[in-house]
């Protein structure tokens, strides 16, 4: 049975999710989209993408819909989710990717509008649960989890390697830095922003800013609560990021033992989520990689019981594929 999906917010993640469904899923079908932008613009941005390239199917539009490969997708432009008629399209799951309805108390309006489940594509508040596929997805409970979060792209990178390393060696405490591609929340030129660092031109600066990813790991790995913190360095690349984690273990380890633990996990139960590489990667090498986390074995460093590791991630496509896996899990339990 095909599960019917609605997307609220047809921006970077919304459009990437649409592409991921087309490319990778036989079980999901996007039947409706809500975005305040006009349909001509939405169809153009779906058809042509500066990172992903041209969509391999014909895209057309009219006043009420976008048609992709001959399939019509209804399009709405409602500011308030409660005014959406998901029921009219038999929508089962809504991907909430506007960035505005990260409070589950607001996002549950999608359920009131006819959907069965809501997945927020960002860190959330008041959600029923937060999941990183491959880390804690097996705790998903369809009876009690109706509005859930797929966490952030950085948490989806950090959590898989943190789980493996904590289970194997024990993380006492640690600090992380994500070297992160710039995003739409930054300014192209110097211009006002509530974060004065993000107010500076994104394409010519390294921009230090906050990330909640380290603390959010505790939502999917409670055993690490209070043990990790960190920040982000936004850099002038359009996508392709890396998470640097430095941590202390309970006993001395070696580069070889750290890498072996990750490699074993990557070829085993974490295969879709966590990859292991001994190649001399740079950021463009991992663009359009579907893993949430791509461990770079050549960058592992050890001094006594202090360890530094790095994992890459395509902060758009890799995260979207993680979101797709989570959506397929939810769909399988409807």
Curated annotation (Swiss-Prot):
- For site (Activates thiol group during catalysis), what residue positions does UniProt give? 180
Hey, which pathway is this one from? Carbohydrate degradation; glycolysis; pyruvate from D-glyceraldehyde 3-phosphate: step 1/5
List this protein's GO terms for biological process. glucose metabolic process; glycolytic process
| Family under the similarity heading | Belongs to the glyceraldehyde-3-phosphate dehydrogenase family.
> Which UniProt keywords are given for this protein, alphabetically ordered?
Cytoplasm, Glycolysis, NAD, Nucleotide-binding, Oxidoreductase
Q: What is its main location?
A: cytoplasm
Instruction: Tell me the enzyme class.
Output: oxidoreductase
Describe its partners and assembly state.
Homotetramer.
Q: Which SMART domains match?
A: Gp_dh_N
Please write the reaction equations for the catalytic activity of this protein. Answer: D-glyceraldehyde 3-phosphate + phosphate + NAD(+) = (2R)-3-phospho-glyceroyl phosphate + NADH + H(+)
Compartments, as annotated in UniProt: Cytoplasm
Q: What is this protein called?
A: Glyceraldehyde-3-phosphate dehydrogenase
The EC number(s) this enzyme carries: 1.2.1.12
**Where does this protein hold NAD(+)?**
12-13, 35, 79, 121, 315
Q: Which residues form the active site?
A: 153
Task: Give the gene symbol.
Answer: gap
